[in-house]
Amino acid sequence: MSSKLLTIQLLEELVHAAELNQEGKTADYIPELANVNQELTAIAVQPLGEKTLAYSNNPLHPVTLQSTGKMIPLIGLLEEFGADQLFEWVKVEPSGDDFASITRLEQFGPKPSNPMLNAGAIALCSRIPGVGEQQFRWLEHWVQKLFNQRLSINPLVFASEKRTGNRNRALAYLLKSRNNLGADVHETLDLYFALCSYEAMLDQMLYLPAVLANRGQDPDTGEQILSIETCKITLAIMATCGLYDETGTHMVKTGMPAKSGVSGYTIAVVPGKAGIVVLSPRVNAKGNSIRGEIMLEGLSKAMGWHFALP
């Protein structure tokens, strides 16, 4: 049972509680990600059938998707090719390794362990249909569909990703050497770097988790945006792989399928109830937002939203 109503006051309490934690730092291996206010802490919730509530301790600005963008090729390819084909390209098993692990791919390849790892997302980007501009138009189409609006690519982050992305290049070449890359290495990586470099405001991040919470339907119009089957598979992957080798801890504490990114965004879903996004760029060594997890755990406890509760 919920112990509190969902109110702005509750969200404010969650933000202030999270602010007390001074651990973590902004990701600096992509230089542009370090140029943000590390004290920014925010949360937004879209309860199904109710108005959106949001609270931030600082003025908001667009933040790049980073690994939350891995949802885009996963969902788009599931919708267009189906699960059987997708599972020919990538597995859906928790890895227990960090998000950019090369040894995992070497030992257990040629299929990446799951679509939430860098190797998995790169493999899926290589399967985006078309060539060159056609693939970017495919990406634009699915961004529009999953965010209900167009998003812009941050050119500085995109350039920074390309300049510092040698580990991702290594993963792509390893996939290519194992015959599990469906396109040219450089073209595939351009798609992957673009995927990570889309930027969105806090409220723009809410549409996708709300659709997933609502069995694939637009929470306002009721239009079927995604199939129920795609929602089911996507939520299962988020629940088991969404926060890399910290997913188990996350699920024990929050009971919410989620997907994190090193920019500080985490989207979370309470099936049948709400879509959630939290933002704080202070991330831990595993690439997950520390304050974001504090807010999600507090929200789950306050609202009784842990999946294991009757």
From Swiss-Prot:
GO terms for molecular function: glutaminase activity. Keywords: Hydrolase. Substrate binds at S67, N118, E161, N168, Y192, Y244, V262. InterPro entries: Beta-lactam/transpept-like, Glutaminase. It catalyses: L-glutamine + H2O = L-glutamate + NH4(+). The keyword Magnesium does not apply. Its EC number is 3.5.1.2. SUPFAM superfamilies: beta-lactamase/transpeptidase-like. It comes from the Bacteria. It holds the Pfam family Glutaminase. Homotetramer. Belongs to the glutaminase family. This is Glutaminase. The lineage of its organism: Bacteria, Pseudomonadati, Pseudomonadota, Gammaproteobacteria, Legionellales.
